[in-house]
Amino acid sequence: MSSSNENAKAQAPEKSDFTRRCSLLSRYLKEKGSFGNIDLGLYRKPDSSLALPGKFDPPGKQNAMHKAGHSKGEPSTSSGGKVKDVADLSESQPGSSQLTIFFGGKVLVYNEFPVDKAKEIMEVAKQAKPVTEINIQTPINDENNNNKSSMVLPDLNEPTDNNHLTKEQQQQQEQNQIVERIARRASLHRFFAKRKDRAVARAPYQVNQNAGHHRYPPKPEIVTGQPLEAGQSSQRPPDNAIGQTMAHIKSDGDKDDIMKIEEGQSSKDLDLRL
C-alpha cells in the first residue's frame, strides 16, 4: 500500500500546464461570471448605422450592465423590450426635419424645422389667394416684334412699274434676262444630249439611223429549164412560174402530135401515087 501511495504522489505533479490553466479559467468564470476586461477578439464591432445601445457591446460590458441593473432593483428586459422603449421615446419627442420653400423665384431651405410649424405654414398658404400670372416680356422680344411690324412684304401678283427705273437698270435687267435664256437653252441641249447617249447605251441592239432609206438588193430572176448554178438559192418558184412551165410542156407535146399526123398523111399520099 505504501508503494502505491508513493506512485500516486509521484504522478500528481506530472499534470500539463494546459489542464491547470483550464481549471483556473473555469474557477474564474464561476466566481466572476465573465472575462472582465479581457478582450479575446470574439465580439463584433458595433455598426455605425445602428446606434442602438447594448446591441453590439462586448460580452463583458453587457454582463456588467446586466448586474448593475439587478443591483439597483430595475426589472430585467430583453433586447426587444429595449428597442421598443427607444422607439417610444423617439415618438414622444417632437420631430424635426428639413423644410424647402419655393417663393418668389427663390428656393429656401431650413434644417431641423419642427413639424407643427410646417403644418401651420401649409394652412396659411392654403388660405392665401392664388397669385395671378404676370406676363413679362423681355426687351429682345419687343425689338423682334417691332422689326416684324416694320417689314412690308411686296405683293408678287401686282405688276411692277418700269417707269420708275432708270435706263441703266432697264438695260441691266434685259441683259440678265438674255443671259438666263442662253443658260437655260444650253442646259436643255446638254440634257437632251445626255439622254440620247443613255438611250443608245441601254438599247439591246444598234439603232440604224438610215432605216427608212434602206434599199434591199433585187431578187434574182428565175429561168425555167436551166440548172441552178453554184451560189444561187434553191427556193421554190412562185405558182405563176409553175403554170407557165406546164403550158410550155403541153405546147411542145401538141407540136409532136401534129408532126406525126403530117408524116402519116404524106406516107398515104405516096402509096396512092405508086
Swiss-Prot record:
<dbReference type="InterPro" id="IPR010399">
    <property type="entry name" value="Tify_dom"/>
</dbReference>
<comment type="subunit">
    <text>(Microbial infection) Interacts with the pathogenic Pseudomonas syringae HopZ1a protein.</text>
</comment>
<dbReference type="Pfam" id="PF06200">
    <property type="entry name" value="tify"/>
</dbReference>
<feature type="compositionally biased region" description="Polar residues">
    <location>
        <begin position="139"/>
        <end position="150"/>
    </location>
</feature>
<dbReference type="GO" id="GO:0006952">
    <property type="term" value="P:defense response"/>
</dbReference>
<dbReference type="InterPro" id="IPR018467">
    <property type="entry name" value="CCT_CS"/>
</dbReference>
<dbReference type="Pfam" id="PF09425">
    <property type="entry name" value="Jas_motif"/>
</dbReference>
<keyword id="KW-0175">Coiled coil</keyword>
<dbReference type="GO" id="GO:0009753">
    <property type="term" value="P:response to jasmonic acid"/>
</dbReference>
<comment type="function">
    <text>Repressor of jasmonate responses.</text>
</comment>
<keyword id="KW-0804">Transcription</keyword>
<comment type="subunit">
    <text>Homo- and heterodimer. Interacts with MYC2, MYC3, MYC4, AFPH2/NINJA, TIFY10A/JAZ1, TIFY10B/JAZ2, TIFY11B/JAZ6, TIFY5A/JAZ8 and TIFY3B/JAZ12.</text>
</comment>
<feature type="domain" description="Tify">
    <location>
        <begin position="92"/>
        <end position="127"/>
    </location>
</feature>
<dbReference type="InterPro" id="IPR040390">
    <property type="entry name" value="TIFY/JAZ"/>
</dbReference>
<feature type="short sequence motif" description="Jas">
    <location>
        <begin position="182"/>
        <end position="206"/>
    </location>
</feature>
<feature type="short sequence motif" description="Nuclear localization signal">
    <location>
        <begin position="183"/>
        <end position="190"/>
    </location>
</feature>
<feature type="region of interest" description="Disordered">
    <location>
        <begin position="139"/>
        <end position="176"/>
    </location>
</feature>
<keyword id="KW-0832">Ubl conjugation</keyword>
<feature type="region of interest" description="Disordered">
    <location>
        <begin position="49"/>
        <end position="95"/>
    </location>
</feature>
<feature type="region of interest" description="Disordered">
    <location>
        <begin position="206"/>
        <end position="274"/>
    </location>
</feature>
<keyword id="KW-0007">Acetylation</keyword>
<keyword id="KW-0611">Plant defense</keyword>
<feature type="compositionally biased region" description="Basic and acidic residues">
    <location>
        <begin position="249"/>
        <end position="274"/>
    </location>
</feature>
<keyword id="KW-0805">Transcription regulation</keyword>
<keyword id="KW-0539">Nucleus</keyword>
<comment type="similarity">
    <text>Belongs to the TIFY/JAZ family.</text>
</comment>
<feature type="coiled-coil region">
    <location>
        <begin position="161"/>
        <end position="185"/>
    </location>
</feature>
<protein>
    <recommendedName>
        <fullName>Protein TIFY 11A</fullName>
    </recommendedName>
</protein>
<keyword id="KW-1184">Jasmonic acid signaling pathway</keyword>
<dbReference type="GO" id="GO:0005634">
    <property type="term" value="C:nucleus"/>
</dbReference>
